[in-house]
């Protein structure tokens, strides 16, 4: 007879853009609606979501719209509910550490957005609590599950690049100020006092991307900027942008084999897109190069590399983009958030650690913190090892 395990997941902060679109709409609901998933031993795992948020009207509306039986505006009661297995958090950064700490001390498994905390000290404390509590803790590392980066990582594993020399990334798009056209990101993102800022937000992503594609991040040199000093909030009220809206970073990396690699990532909410995707990474090596976005990845082997000659007197006649070949998926690649959710849920049921946990998240917070320090002190800063 087939065994069935029911996992109850409380989802806090799903009225926000990412919490709703990626975690609820494209991950948990499709898993639920498919009847769950089956483990290697034949056990059927079914998901029961519980929607949690501060706005009762929004939460009730979402619950009714998506046929979710349970919802609550009382996070504490949900955390202390013995029938709840997992607390997921996608709320404001400034509220996250307290929520995660409370959940783990109550014996709940946690799955969370990043950053896990506003300070490295808090992030390390969370990692310690998770280890002591013996819960399964997972942190969203969505970009490593995206088709483009899955293909890029495969090229690394196959030795396509030879010795890797560098990785460079371009991320960002124009976020409207909110006066004439509404901003497509929440206003708290641009207020430092509310946990906003490009460096705080994105360096925790870049840490796991650099670790996952290349290797250990050894140092950081960053320059931040607040390019747009005045914005308008959701109510149309003018406010001062106190957080950085762009961050330009240079990183020293080390591959598992001990090779030194230079990384460079530009991140900006004040840039107009002239590239194929909103984020792109280019890896260059002695034997080949590749460019990966969210979905697509193209590569150029050493044997197929053209030999351009600098001549500013003549127009360029060759199309450099046409000289790259698309890397095939060779597999069905699902939504990145959904893939990690399924992996995390399997780990919870099996009672094992998730490969992207709170220590990885702490390294992301550390990189953001040291990036801001690098900007303030105008120097390169070495990154020390974190120990629990």
UniProtKB/Swiss-Prot annotation:
GO terms for biological process: D-xylose catabolic process; protein homotetramerization. It catalyses: D-xylose + NADP(+) = D-xylono-1,5-lactone + NADPH + H(+); D-xylose + NAD(+) = D-xylono-1,5-lactone + NADH + H(+). Induction: Is induced by D-xylose. No significant levels of expression can detected when the cells are grown on various other sugars such as L-xylose, L-arabinose, D-galactose, D-tagatose and D-glucose. Pathway: Carbohydrate metabolism; D-xylose degradation. GO terms for molecular function: D-xylose 1-dehydrogenase (NAD+) activity; D-xylose 1-dehydrogenase (NADP+) activity; NAD binding; NADP binding; zinc ion binding. It comes from the Bacteria. Binds 2 Zn(2+) ions per subunit. Belongs to the Gfo/Idh/MocA family. PANTHER family: BCDNA.GH03377. Catalyzes the NADP(+)-dependent oxidation of D-xylose. Is able to use both NADP(+) and NAD(+); however, the enzyme shows a very strong preference for NADP(+). Is likely involved in the first step of the oxidative D-xylose degradation pathway. This is D-xylose dehydrogenase. The gene is xdh.
